[in-house]
């Protein structure tokens, strides 16, 4: 999938922002950018992105939210809400940082 912001690593950019600023950016993300983040999350869940035991332990805390985030029937607004939830984005970003 082509990046919605050519030349910009969205995950790395969001990871560097403060929590408040990240929430503001996630709130105005385009549909394509949101799909990119959701796809990365799905790849972590499916095991396509190798994760260490400590990363999996961190993700396990957010299991229900991760499954809802990657669900086909989850609305765009709900996905944005889930990504802003405490710790969820950081757990996913930490798991995909070596690949993305």
Show where each model-derived region lies.
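Terminal export/targeting leaders at protein ends
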Residues: 1-85
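Membrane-inserting effector segments that mediate pore formation, membrane fusion
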Residues: 77-100
């Amino acid at each position: 999938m082509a990046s919605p912001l050519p030349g910009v690593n969205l995950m790395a950019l969001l990871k560097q922002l403060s929590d408040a600023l990240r929430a503001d950016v996630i709130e105005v993300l385009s549909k394509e950018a949101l799909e990119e983040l959701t796809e990365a999350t799905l790849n972590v869940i499916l095991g396509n992105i190798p994760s260490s035991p400590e990363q999996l332990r961190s993700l396990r805390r957010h299991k229900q939210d991760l499954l809802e985030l990657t669900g086909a029937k989850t609305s765009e607004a709900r996905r944005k809400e889930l990504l802003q939830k405490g710790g969820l984005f950081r757990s996913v970003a930490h798991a995909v940082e070596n690949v993305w």
